[in-house]
Amino acid sequence: MRAWAHGVQRHGSAMAGSARLRMTPRMAKQCAGKVGIRKGMQKMLEAKDISFAYSGGRVLYDGLSLQVAPGERVALCAPSGFGKTTLCRILAGYLKPTAGSVMVDGSPLPLRGMCPVQLIGQHPENMVDPRQTMDGMLAEAGDVSSELLSGLGIRPEWRRRHAHELSGGELQRFCIARALACAPRYLVADESTAMFDAVTQARVWRFLMRWCEENGTGLVFVSHSPELIGHVATRTIMLGAR
């Protein structure tokens, strides 16, 4: 994928020398205090002894544990049908595990959609209010800088549109922008760029890598692309591996 050849590094700064993408003071204040960090507690997103079973009795996980440190970019790899999307929803607080716990910087994970963990799903149409314009959706999230929007390739005229007036890729960029505007400590991305062409996918991932590096944001992501994983991940977890 030649699109990756420009500015992507597995380690270090993805765009050295460019303007820095720090959270604005309002964004940092928005995130602060959402989750208290106990003195002496190591900062991390931690799933401990997670088990999950469907109502019919099918067990998806039994005692799964993982940790993600601030600034890490962790790829989750597993065959189709293993339950990667379910795990992403558990990590972001959208699903409650049958057993076990998810902790964020030493405290229980808050309700879904709140800082400090934001989910970027693979179906953006399921994560927006169809009655809102994109400007309205972003205004609810927090500070949205022009650098954030331009970095994701969002055109100004798109902001006045509703979800049904945008393509899937355009809508997904707004979902990514909203997640970042919430000033999360951790991002969970479930095949969130699979709908993009190669050039757009590379651009979005360069931006996400740069954001995470400069803000110390931990990233958990799912992808079936070995090349993308090789360029983005600082660590890979093979789910189901013994």
Task: Please report, for each region that a protein language model flagged, where it lies by residue.
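Hydrophobic anchor residue at the start of the ABC signature
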Residues: 176
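Conserved ABC ATPase signature
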Residues: 162-166, 170
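Helix-to-loop junction immediately C-terminal to a conserved catalytic motif
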Residues: 92
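Q-loop/switch helix immediately C-terminal to the Walker
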Residues: 123, 130-145
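Conserved structural motif at the start of ABC-family nucleotide-binding domains
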Residues: 45, 60-63
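Conserved ABC transporter NBD signature motif
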Residues: 100-113
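The feature captures the beta-strand-to-loop junction immediately N-terminal to the Walker
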Residues: 77-79
